[in-house]
């Protein structure tokens, strides 16, 4: 079955993504921390089963940020999951280019996901040691 991609909807954050972050033991980011209040990304499906999703921040420079990649931990088709993640990152990256970005940035810790980004032409920048966030 072919995979399909669609934009995130108003309810995907609560209905799907929060559960996925929980499956992986991660704290979900606040909805208003994400692009377009949680709707600024895309989701990949295998039929009616959601596999993975991710976000794209656009900036006031030529930089786009592709991040917050998350997947359904219990989706068991390993090869299709890998392909879905590649498709997700590739499509988000393509969208960045279409809207005028010259550079695409990502902050990733997961080694498997780092490998996916590298396979798609991303190169490693500096290794960071701390994420710094301040809530105003």
Residue ranges and their predicted role:
Residues 43, 49-58, 64-67:
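Conserved beta-strand in the GNAT
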Residues 78-94:
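Conserved acetyl-CoA-binding loop-helix of GNAT-fold acetyltransferases
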Residues 107, 123-136:
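Conserved catalytic-core motifs of GNAT/GCN5-like acyltransferases
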Residues 1-30:
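Short amphipathic alpha-helix that is part of the acyltransferase structural core
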Residues 104-115:
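Conserved beta-strand-loop-alpha-helix junction that forms the acyl-donor binding cleft
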Residues 62-80:
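Conserved acetyl-CoA binding element of GNAT-fold acetyltransferases
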Residues 115-122:
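Conserved active-site tyrosine of GNAT-family acetyltransferases
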């Amino acid at each position: 079955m072919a995979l399909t991609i669609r934009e995130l909807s108003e309810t995907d954050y609560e209905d799907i993504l929060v559960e996925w972050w929980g499956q992986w033991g991660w704290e979900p980011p606040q909805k208003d921390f994400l692009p377009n209040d949680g709707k600024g990304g895309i989701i990949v499906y295998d039929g009616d089963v959601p596999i993975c999703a991710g976000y794209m921040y656009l900036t006031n420079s030529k930089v786009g940020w592709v991040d917050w990649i998350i997947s359904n931990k219990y989706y068991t088709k390993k090869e299709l999951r890998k392909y879905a993640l590649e498709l997700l990152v590739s499509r988000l990256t393509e969208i960045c280019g279409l809207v005028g970005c010259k550079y695409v940035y990502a902050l990733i810790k997961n080694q498997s996901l780092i490998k996916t980004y590298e396979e798609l032409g991303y190169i490693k920048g500096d290794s960071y040691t701390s994420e710094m966030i301040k809530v105003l």
